[in-house]
Amino acid sequence: MSIVFDENLDLFCLETANTSYIIGLADHRTFVGHVYYGKRVRGQDLRYLLRTGEAPFVPSENERERCSFYDTFPSEYSGNGVGDYRESSIAVRTQAGQHAVMPTYVSYEITDQKPQLPGLPSAFDREHTAQTLILHCRDEVLQLDVDLYYTVFEENDMITRSVRISN
């Protein structure tokens, strides 16, 4: 399998022939963090790379440091206007003028296919060997769904990413 979720470590491991892409869940499976991308690693606990045990602590442990946490956490898909002052992955504005968005983790699914991206250029899975991880995230205030797609073409040593946003 190209994609594995370790329930005990809350880590998703996506592997090709030569690379690993590791994504972690933090703070009681609330936040999706980028852990590692690089040379293939196997069976290692890389959660320490999320640095959630260091100050500023995760919001469930210290609510006063919420903004500091957002500004330092290696978010896989960062929000906007909630304390993370780095370049954000998403920017929205509602009719009421709300613009703060913080997608948090809801669930995941792993499929044995590459989803199509209508109207967009994308890789194809003619041999039907690709595997896709879908991380379902949601901003409850804006009622905004953010689905993160990661497709692994293990034999081609390629991982593709895309995002689908809906409200």
What are these regions (language model features)?
Residues 1-167:
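N-terminal accessory beta-strand-rich subdomains and adjacent acidic, glycine-rich linkers
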